[in-house]
């Protein structure tokens, strides 16, 4: 696929899907696509379908136009699925993918199975938002589109610190800055700023963390009861696994939070040796070499034990 515009020439309706529990790259890339279509293809009706997005992303142009339900029975001419490695990731919104006349997947997960009619998948790229930049004509990237793309890149690179960050990533970030975006505000207010309760729950997670595999792995978890006590939601737990990862001499960081009794969301980060994407796929998840996750059943301790057993094979 050369440019996104080549797919829009003969369509009237477009659905844009991201993944459940949308993060910065998901929200940023989806809204970048939406803004591009609504700005330069006014005759095309475009709709983003996502679960409710974190409030920190509400400043992005079009965030108030995101549809959070799948009640409408619409057969779209084109369905673009972004930042999703398989057909489970969009959740209930996958109905629009299944009924669309043509489907496209734009993604950067190594576990992507190329499930659409057209698949634009590059695992070596830092983020789906970076991919979106390459699919748009630079002269048509408005300040609003640039804000969306920059936000996505910032969040999936950990503010340009993860190994997926490349020279091209930095070059693209510079071009986005030239569009006049308030890049310091985007970084401070969407990545670093935390509420008091977010800091408290992170503090608990760090205090409760334990070392495994002779110090090569650090893990922690929070329960539904913990989230209720600290008055936070799953979307407020961003950053905990990254903070665990920077512990000295740690190779693998695990963070789990309880989705429902007996079921946890697992996030994994590694530094140099462990391919967490391979581990995630083993347990029905997916992701990248250094960042991956899965939904798993069992107690937190049992899940940590299973992950450590797989990681040990790579560390030997």
Regions found by a protein language model. Give the residues of each.
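Hydrophobic/aromatic residues located in beta-strands of well-ordered beta-sheets
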Residues: 46-48, 103, 149
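Short N-terminal binding/cap micro-motifs at the start of the first secondary-structure element
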Residues: 23-27
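Short alpha-helices
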Residues: 106-172
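Generic enzyme active-site microenvironment
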Residues: 17, 21, 81, 105-106, ...
């Amino acid at each position: 696929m050369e440019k996104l515009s080549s797919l829009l020439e003969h369509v009237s309706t477009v659905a844009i899907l991201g993944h459940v529990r949308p993060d910065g790259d998901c929200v940023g890339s989806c809204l970048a696509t939406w803004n591009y279509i609504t700005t330069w293809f006014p005759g095309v009706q475009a709709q983003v379908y996502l679960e409710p997005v974190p409030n920190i992303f509400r400043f992005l142009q079009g965030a108030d136009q995101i549809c959070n339900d799948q009640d409408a029975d619409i057969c779209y001419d084109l369905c673009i699925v972004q930042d999703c490695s398989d057909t489970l990731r969009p959740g209930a919104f996958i109905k629009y993918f299944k009924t669309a006349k043509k489907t496209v997947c734009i993604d950067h997960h190594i576990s992507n199975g190329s499930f659409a009619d057209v698949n634009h998948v590059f695992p070596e790229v830092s983020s789906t938002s970076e991919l979106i930049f390459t699919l748009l004509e630079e002269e048509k990237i408005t300040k609003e589109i640039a804000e969306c793309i920059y936000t996505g890149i910032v969040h999936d690179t950990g503010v340009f610190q993860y190994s997926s960050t490349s020279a091209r990533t930095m070059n693209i970030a510079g071009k986005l800055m030239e569009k006049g975006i308030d890049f310091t505000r985007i970084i401070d207010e969407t990545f670093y700023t935390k509420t008091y309760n977010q800091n408290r729950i992170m503090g608990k997670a760090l205090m409760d963390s334990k070392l495994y595999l002779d110090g090569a792995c650090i893990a922690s978890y929070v329960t539904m009861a913990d989230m209720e006590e600290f008055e936070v939601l799953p979307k407020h737990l961003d950053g905990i696994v990254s903070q665990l990862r920077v512990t000295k001499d740690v190779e693998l960081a695990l963070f789990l939070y309880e989705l429902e009794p007996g079921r946890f969301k697992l996030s994994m980060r590694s530094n140099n040796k462990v391919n967490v994407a391979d581990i995630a796929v083993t347990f029905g998840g997916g992701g990248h070499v250094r960042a991956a996750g899965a939904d798993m059943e069992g107690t937190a301790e049992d899940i940590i034990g299973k992950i450590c057993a797989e990681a040990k094979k790579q560390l030997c």
